Amino acid sequence: MPGLIPESATVKGPQGVRRDALKARPRLPLRLWQGVWWALSILVRRKPLGAASALILCGLVVVAILAPVLAPYDPYKFNLNERGLPIRLQPPNAKFLCGTDPLGRDVLSRIVYGSRVSLIVGFASVAIGTLLGTLLGLVSGYWEGGVDQVLQRAVDTMMALPGIVLALAVVSVLGQSLTNIILVIGLVIAPGASRVVRGTVLSIKQNTFIDAAYAAGATPWRIVLRHILPNAFAPILIIASVWLGNAIVIEAALSFLGLGTPPPTPTWGGMLSGEGRRNLETAPYLAIFPGLAISIVVLAFNMLGDALRDLLDPRLRTR
């Protein structure tokens, strides 16, 4: 039909430059992948330890997703010998790479399945805590005065208590469940996130583009969501990456104290507090392997958080 340009046709632009109409269309998925690849390339070049940490964490995610495929045995099943008795406290060998616990269950399989609980608790609790803390920080930083005073006094009260003590108190009241643990850890994260976001908002408010948006008639919430929040994304991302490791440590501590995810669900902290602590002298591998898993994951999250901070903070980009 006349007047229509085929997708493969070439057209002449306003400056006389010929271009392909199909290529001129935006390709969001391609641009998204290009942005991700660009960010990864910068991370590898400038912060190789951060890139290695990201690789370790990606491997952990793959292990958690493919746990039914990668685990050599059922983590809940008692492995029996020829006489039908559980293979108890078998040290690491070719058949059981990380040994067996007092009930004959494979330790490696329980560690693999325990990564699921750690990741679920880590990502879910950090998401809840970061969202809540970001909301409180935005409101407190932009609307100063009485609102700021009330919110910050509440934040000071929560931060006066050690995080693990607050988590113990709330879990003791709400009871043991995975959902309660996620909510409790999110509640522990929120005050610190709120304080960081508030400071960032107070700094961003001093820029002239905020005054320009206000003069143009933008509503307060539009200024907060369209101008302040995008510029506060870098500190929020750094907080989340660092708190992921802390959330896993808190979950392991609660499990170690008997207030974590109830058995028989395998968790790294539960393995430390249960079989690992009771058999530390006779079978130290029951505590070594779960403890090593916790240490590696927390170290990887902390190193990734440091790398992101150095890359996103303008004051540290020259390092």
Kindly label every feature range from the protein language model:
Residues 1-55, 303-319:
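Transmembrane alpha-helical segments of polytopic membrane transport and secretion proteins
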Residues 2-8, 12-14, 55, 63-100, ...:
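Hydrophobic alpha-helical transmembrane segments of membrane transport/permease proteins
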Residues 33-46, 97-100, 108, 225, ...:
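A short amphipathic helical element positioned immediately N-terminal to and/or at the very start
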Residues 36, 50-57, 220, 232, ...:
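Primarily residues marking transmembrane-helix entry/exit sites
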Residues 41, 63-73, 139, 194, ...:
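Structural signature of transmembrane alpha-helix termini at the membrane-water interface
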Residues 48-58, 102-319:
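Alpha-helical transmembrane segments of integral membrane proteins
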Residues 59, 65-72, 235, 247, ...:
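Phosphate/oxyanion-binding loops and surfaces in catalytic or ligand/nucleic-acid-binding neighborhoods
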